[in-house]
Amino acid sequence: MTTLRWDGDDLVDFADGPDRWRLDGTVDIPSIRRSFGLPFDRGLVSPSGRFQAVYAERGTKALLLQGGEIVRELTRDPYPCAADTIDYPIALGALSDGREVVVHCPDHPYVLQIDDAQTGQRLTDGPRDQPDVYQSRLSISPDGRRLMTAGERYGNDEVMIFDLDLAVRDASALDGDGIMPLDAYCTDVAAACWLDSDRVVIATTDHEPLFDDADALGPRQLGVWSVSQSRWLHRATVGYPMGTLIACGSRVITLYGHPQLLDPITGDVIAEWPDVPIGTTQGSYEDTNFPTPIAALHPDRTRLAIAEPDAITILTLPSP
């Protein structure tokens, strides 16, 4: 399977089939299987559920879908090395005015663009600069006001946050370093996610610090950053490596080696499942692709589904 989403208590792979798994172990596989004709291995769904996208994590092609039907083809610029080493940059979401959008890099791997999902209209027309950042791991805040990217610059994994309300009025707002100071952290970023519309959780690797600053997020730390206050609310040093982060209410799930449920304030491990092996991906840049784990959190935050090679594992999460 290549994509996974919850539909009630069923799990659906909307890129293949679509196939449907039920909690009683039965599987609905259509007699006539849908095929998009391209080797897509990842997918995402807009918060409203209205739009979906399927894409090749290390490729140049994607499809925007609505109700399983193709709306249009998307591409990313086949810039030398970018498609082979950087995860496909794409996010689906809604702006603060309710317009559903696609954020991606169709023209250049450094340049973020915002398109109306329904019409395809480019909302960020105009002259643009090309900052030396391979954009990747895009995510829109729940209120649609901000965009976070977790890409790569000169071999370092970085996080940047941009004002989307400003960007649709002045596209050049997406060309700088954003509204989060780059000296807020002093080492490579392993993963990041929105905790809510103001707070982001950032996990770092164990790489040596690039500079010394006691106020910066350092190696192997977990931090909660407030965008509105432009400061760290919490920082904790942890004794374990971290990978992909998934927000789960006031907690976060990290996927590295095996799933762990964390308290982002203290860094404490609330629960873990060492018998569920997953990859060891950190950041969005690798010469050799270590695929991002395929996982889906149930909307009620009580269950996490993880795709394994021959099965789907469903984890029951402890109550807050």
Region annotations inferred by a language model:
Residues E152-L164, A203-L217:
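Short, conserved, GDST-rich strand-edge loop motifs in beta-rich repeat architectures
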Residues I70-R99, H104-Y110, R122-Q135:
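Asp-box/WD-like beta-propeller blade repeats and closely related beta-sheet repeat scaffolds
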Residues M1-G49, V54-Y55:
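Extended, helix-rich scaffolding/adaptor regions
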Residues R122-A173:
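Loop-centered beta-sheet repeat module
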Residues T292-P320:
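Blade-level signature of beta-propeller repeat domains, shared across WD40, Kelch, NHL, RCC1
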Residues D9-R20, G49-E57, A62-L63, G98-P106, ...:
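Short beta-strand elements that form the blades of beta-propeller/WD-repeat-like
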Residues G17-F36, G59-A83, Q113-P127, I161-I179, ...:
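Surface-exposed loop/turn elements that mediate protein-protein interactions on large endomembrane-trafficking
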Residues M1-R5, S35-S48, P80-G93, V133-S139, ...:
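Repeated scaffold domains used in trafficking and secretory/extracellular systems
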